[in-house]
């Protein structure tokens, strides 16, 4: 069981809850999602409550995260898109903290569950659709008719644009889920090699050096991937929000 690279993604029911035949149990995934929100909120509170003129290192990290999201949203959707800043910033911090939490031993990576990443993606696309129709009415549908397209191929282009739009939550969720899943499986496999070889005596310990070095290298790479996936998720969210703010562009 310890060497099974898939076991780390198992969903365990901690508090069974059944409501009308619907399983609403509190699981390890639920617990670490709550932990993610608490840690992210606590970090932002502690780093934003300082009164000193010179920011601490943690304050600087918090400010960089703020500026990154604000700049990405402003560049993608303009000043009108800044009303979505709390939403996008919350998504960024949740994905980032969830990714980092999962890199520590015995901690769960909630973003390795497709149901979690797909729910986040549906939240993004649902917000885009709701705001698009709320703000522009049926003018939001201009999103599916790019300007300058010859009339004869408009039906084909509209069909392609609709399929592309509907595939966004799938691509957005699978990208995050697959990267976190693959990275953790690879890390677990190399760590398993280290444990297995070390149990073979002196010769095995010598042979475990290379897998150990690979494990350290992959761990460092996973921290980079954890940030990059939060970065990509946020940038794409900003681009999708631009479609809701400026559907005719």
Swiss-Prot record:
Gene3D superfamilies: ATP synthase, F0 complex, subunit A (1.20.120.220). It comes from the Bacteria. GO terms for molecular function: proton-transporting ATP synthase activity, rotational mechanism. It is a multi-pass membrane protein. It is found in: Cell inner membrane. The chain crosses the membrane at residues 26-46, 84-104, 114-134, 143-163, 185-205, 208-228. GO terms for cellular component: plasma membrane; proton-transporting ATP synthase complex. Pfam families: ATP-synt_A. Keywords: ATP synthesis, Cell inner membrane, Cell membrane, CF(0), Hydrogen ion transport, Ion transport, Membrane, Transmembrane, Transmembrane helix, Transport. InterPro entries: ATP_synth_F0_asu, ATP_synth_F0_asu_AS, ATP_synth_F0_asu_bact/mt, F0_ATP_A_sf. Its main location: membrane. Belongs to the ATPase A chain family. F-type ATPases have 2 components, CF(1) - the catalytic core - and CF(0) - the membrane proton channel. CF(1) has five subunits: alpha(3), beta(3), gamma(1), delta(1), epsilon(1). CF(0) has three main subunits: a(1), b(2) and c(9-12). The alpha and beta chains form an alternating ring which encloses part of the gamma chain. CF(1) is attached to CF(0) by a central stalk formed by the gamma and epsilon chains, while a peripheral stalk is formed by the delta and b chains. Key component of the proton channel; it plays a direct role in the translocation of protons across the membrane. This is ATP synthase subunit a. The gene is atpB.
